[in-house]
Structures are given as C-alpha cells and as structure tokens.
Amino acid sequence: MVSNTIRVAVGILGNAASMLLYAAPILTFRRVIKKGSVEEFSCVPYILALFNCLLYTWYGLPVVSSGWENSTVSSINGLGILLEIAFISIYTWFAPRERKKFVLRMVLPVLAFFALTAIFSSFLFHTHGLRKVFVGSIGLVASISMYSSPMVAAKQVITTKSVEFMPFYLSLFSFLSSALWMIYGLLGKDLFIASPNFIGCPMGILQLVLYCIYRKSHKEAEKLHDIDQENGLKVVTTHEKITGREPEAQRD
C-alpha cells in the first residue's frame, strides 16, 4: 500500500516534469512565428515525440493496461499528443516546401503505424498481459528513438560550438522527466515504462553537460555580433556626418 502511494506520488511528479518537457518548445515556436522561419530547427524530435505519446496513451488505457493502473501515463501523453500536433502544424506552416514534404512523409506513416498497432493489440491479443507486451515493445523502440533524436542537436552543438539550437529547458526537463518515469516504472515493476528512461536519463545528462561547456562560447559569439553591429552603425553615422548624405550602395 505504501509503495503504491509512493508510485502514485512519483507519477504525479513525472506528469509535472513531462508537462514542462512537452511545453518547453513553446519558446522555440514563439521564435519561429516571430521570425516567420524554422531556421535550422528540425521537426524530427516532435514527430518522434508524437509517435511516443500516441503509443503510451494507448498503453495506459484500460484496453491495454489492467484497469487504470497507468492512468498517469495515459493522461500526460494525451496532453503531449495535443502539444506535438500544434508544434508540428506550426513548423509545417513556416517551413520551406521541401521540408513540408519531408514532414508529411514522416507523419503519415507514423499515424498509420499507430493505427495498426491499436487494431492488432485490440483484436489479436485477448489478455492485458499480452497487449502490454505487444504495445510496450513497440513503445520501447519509439522511446529509444525519441531520446536519441536530440543527439542530432548535440552533434550540431559540438560542431558549431553553439547551444542556440539546443534549448536549456528542453534538456533539463528531459532529464527530470526520464528520471521520474524510470523510478515510476521500477516501483510498479513495469519494464516497458522504466527501460526507455534508462536511456533517457544519460541522454539528458549529456545534453546538460554540453550546454554547460558551450554556453559561454554562445554568449561570446552573441557579444561579438552585437559589437559588430554597433561598430557598423558608428561607421555609417560617421560617414553621414562627414558627407552629409547616406553612403551609396555598393556596385557589383
């Protein structure tokens, strides 16, 4: 009874951390909307997150799990579905044509695969145990893919020595969410919840370490950019004062 109470408490904390994780890209997409461009941001993590949320929402429902034993899992992933759909929609709206096509080529198979998973688990397996194994195994692979996708951003950080496209809060909440859900899964002896988070934890730690290493380089680059802009403004202003007119555009 006590262990179940602790598990529920950890699940609630996991829900809170996951909510922050799913909501963290809001800052990124505010920037996308403001600039009217997706810049170098990738949509792959959001598509993989959508697939993961679909699977674990289904996993937590009474169709797969026994009763509402995993209600916290289905509730937070249900919210995740709504947020990921919103992010993917915004990304698609502001993305160039080729990236729009790429998003569609990824999203449609994801939705089709989830539909097949739901149908097969409902009609081919007749016990909760078998359904959990089937859906959980697919969810395990999806979670590993989701937690591995930020490694693309990590590689970019190492290459460019800039954390511009790897937001700090996304890395922090990813680590906290993974740690809490790993504990939740272990307390309930549910390896399909605990296992993927064994991978998510070190991935989150790695991102935080990279952020600590390269954040100074990013700040210094921003300062140099500001100084260059300021110096450019001073040169133009001085030219105007001396000549009494704006500088002519450079000829080809």
Curated annotation (Swiss-Prot):
Domain (MtN3/slv) ranges: 10-98, 134-219
Localization annotation: Cell membrane
Topological type in the membrane: Multi-pass membrane protein
Pfam families xref list: MtN3_slv (PF03083)
GO CC, alphabetical: membrane; plasma membrane
InterPro entries the UniProt entry points to: SWEET, SWEET_rpt
GO molecular function (one): sugar transmembrane transporter activity
Membrane topology, Extracellular segments: 1-8, 65-75, 127-132, 189-190
UniProt keyword list: Cell membrane, Glycoprotein, Membrane, Repeat, Sugar transport, Transmembrane, Transmembrane helix, Transport
Transmembrane segments: 9-29, 44-64, 76-96, 106-126, 133-153, 168-188, 191-211
GO process terms (BP): carbohydrate transport
Glycosylation site list: N70
Keyword Membrane: yes
Superkingdom per UniProt: Eukaryota
UniProt topological domain (Cytoplasmic) ranges: 30-43, 97-105, 154-167, 212-252
Known role: Mediates both low-affinity uptake and efflux of sugar across the plasma membrane.
Quaternary organization: Forms homooligomers and/or heterooligomers.
UniProt family annotation: Belongs to the SWEET sugar transporter family.
Stated name of the protein: Bidirectional sugar transporter SWEET3b
Organism the protein comes from: Oryza sativa subsp. japonica (Rice)
